[in-house]
UniProtKB/Swiss-Prot annotation:
The gene is secA. It holds the Pfam family SecA_DEAD. ATP binds at M95, R96, T97, G98, E99, G100, K101, T102. It comes from Ostreococcus lucimarinus (strain CCE9901). It is a peripheral membrane protein. NCBIfam families: secA. Belongs to the SecA family. This is Protein translocase subunit SecA, chloroplastic. InterPro entries: Helicase_ATP-bd, P-loop_NTPase, SecA, SecA_CS, SecA_DEAD, SecA_motor_DEAD, SecA_preprotein_X-link_dom, SecA_SF2_C.
Amino acid sequence: MLKGDPSEKTKKRYQARVDAVNALGARTKALSDDELRAKTEEFRERLRRGESEDDLLVEAFAVVREAADRVLGLRPFDVQLIGGMILHEGQIAEMRTGEGKTLVSALPAYLNALSGKGVHVVTVNDYLARRDAEWIGQIHKFLGMTCGLIQAGMAEEERRVGYGSDVTYVTNSELGFDYLRDNLAQNTGELVQRDFNFCIIDEVDSILIDEARTPLIISGVADKPSERYIQAAKIADAFEKDYHYKVDEKQKSVLLSEEGYEAAEDLLQVTDLYDPRTQWALYIINAIKAKELQKRDVNYIVRGQEIIIVDEFSGRTMQGRRWSDGLHQAVEAKEGVTIQNETVTIASVTYQAFFKSYPKLGGMTGTAETEITEFSNIYELEVAVVPTNRPVSREDSTDVVFRSETGKWNAVRKEISRMHKKGRPVLVGTTSVERSEQIAELLDEDGIPYELLNAKPENVERESEIVAQSGRKGAVTIATNMAGRGTDILLGGNAEFMARLRVRESLMQRVVMPEDGEIAFEKKGNLAKSGGNKWAVKEGLYPCELSAETAKMLGEAVDTACSVWGDRSLEALDAEERLSFACEKGPSEDEAILALRKVFNAIEAEYKVYTSAEKKEVLGLGGLHVVGTERHESRRVDNQLRGRSGRQGDPGSTRYFLSLEDNLFRIFGGDRIQALMSAFRVEDMPIESGMLTNSLDEAQKKVERYFYDIRKQLFDYDAVLNSQREKVYFERRRALTASREQLQEQMLEYAELTIDDIVNANIDTSEPVSEWPLEGLVGKLRQYCYYFGEIDESDIRPIAEKGGVNALRNFLVKKGQDAYMTKCGEVEATEAGLMMEAERFFILSQTDNLWKQHLQAIKFVQQAVGLRGYAQKDPLIEYKLEGFNLYTEMMAQIRRNVIYSVYMFQPQRLEQKEEAELVGAGGDQKPNSRKK
């Protein structure tokens, strides 16, 4: 170990507890399955008696380690125990690729779920959430805990069950959107989440840093004429860059020139492009952004009539996400697809704000060290580097830099060809769909077979299948950013994964119920290429044909499964979970599980003969070679790609091929790199220069600082809105879950505060009482509540003269609250429980409506305060002040509207079978109708 190695420091810190867990190994191993399972209830009882999770850590980790060995055949290494301890303490564990992060999460998840408050394990996509729930979830189930899974498209009840489990596997987006939907619920029956307790984020840097700039938004439709988007797209297409407009790629912004401004006005026949009534400027600017900054197969792909955003960090599609402020519609107009309506934000939250709402948060990643400052400053999370189980023996070569892209691509092509001829597996990392397909075309010309993994749907569906076989001899895999791919690249191929795919291929078509339209689909011949089996894998995936004996055993096992479970009777998720359990070692009495497990083991053994031999061969050749084709805007993402090679001490190598025309250096490189481009004229000759290497590193650091500053600014501004959001959602939830007495207490409070507002607005206490406009005050109170009709100025002037404003206020508050109680009695006489339903409806509808308006208003404030920097004012301070004023006015408006609606509420008895409506000033919605 090097002196000062952070992983050595981590090891020393936790070694005593690791030794204590190891010391319990023999005793834990001697326990029967039932005795091991009984430990869970013993731990829960000890927590109830006052012990803490820290007190139980050593014993709980020993139990999970033993359960993992029995169920999965995997025994966590010492370094994995250290990772689990780091997560339990609410920190980030940096663990190299291939060191078993997924298994690590089982340790703190079990320990923190013992309290009964639930643990969320968050992954970046549905596939990984399902895989981890099916795989690691077996440990929790074996130990007597419930394990939940949340997937896109699940119904409310399924989500409620999932979140109610001891350990819940879920994606970051599903978790965030469920939080927002819960805070739009109209009754408690719509709530799916419970209070947050402990969260473990896998690929924590991807979620908390890469996605920090993208808020989660629930929108409602707002009408906007699509013709304007089409007109603007035509104008943008006709305009010339650097004449009609300038593009700032660094800021991702465009600016109309004087010529562009005049030309747009002439073409549109308007006198002012910035007229707020038409807002043509916004349409034109968005159309130019769509043309210049949003590139097809880089920033998005087109699928049918839909524009689907591609995540620039992970290379995955972001189904259902849309750019805001009309940009998505501008891209739709550019591509000639159906333009969807503009939207208005109803609820939103950033990941920065959302994940800080957990009492305890931990995370895992292979690359966090470069972002230590950000994790500490924004999330108050420390990063601990976990030592590797075996020393890293990967060789990272120096970057090869060319003047132009042509030279770079020729060199990449030669490098792939050279490695392929040797028989070494090659992983080529690209930054976009477009680039990955460009390399694929070059390899087609050279006759080199390859697998392509990018955001296009036909490739995404085979993702795990492709990645799991990327380590086979001579394999070439082209992939957009490898962040969060979740499947390890095993040298020689993954026999276990292939065996599972082989069983799955035969089993699923027999036990999974047909989907709607599947029969018709099959009749059209769309499944002919896979023999009518949509579960079939690509031809040539398996290393050998099954022996006759094993093939027969597979057929019999599938027949047994059909007999026991029913023919085509299972949901796909249920079948996947049963298959996952069959491919592990957990105890079972299910005849079908045991039959499938037996054949799975037989297939794996046959495949392993070939993969083990191939692994030795690939190791001898030097292992996996990674080719990078562009530096990312973060060193961390580059390191993620490098980390795919050399897992668990295997040999491997990496090399980046760059060009001075790459976006990173072109946009952020500065004068030095421009000077180098002028100095070097040869296209195909690599540039070697110490100054160049330093300049490239400096450019990348500059980008990292630039985007960190953006995220920090976003966090600072969002902290203002988040504080308001928490208070609004607290008040809303208070009304949603309140008992009759609690709701009545809330209404009395609203009445008191509203009368305070009216008194303060009408009385200037600096003037003598004789000057107070009490007649106007009484008039205002009568408008607000007709029960004040019995009071006039002569009733309140003596009170004011004798006791001042406080006495006047107390008198009026008492009258207002008495009026409320009178109204309650009248409404309850009409129908028992109706008042409570009406009050709840008024609070929820007013809160939702005014919060929606507030989000729009505060968005405009944020845009406007940016200009105040020119007036030597701090935009953030200005935003806080104006935001606070808007917030206090909104809260007062909610209270006023609600209590006014209650006072004016006039329920009527209607004949049987006719619906009774609640009529008030409570917004557009109507509460559940009732029959009398």
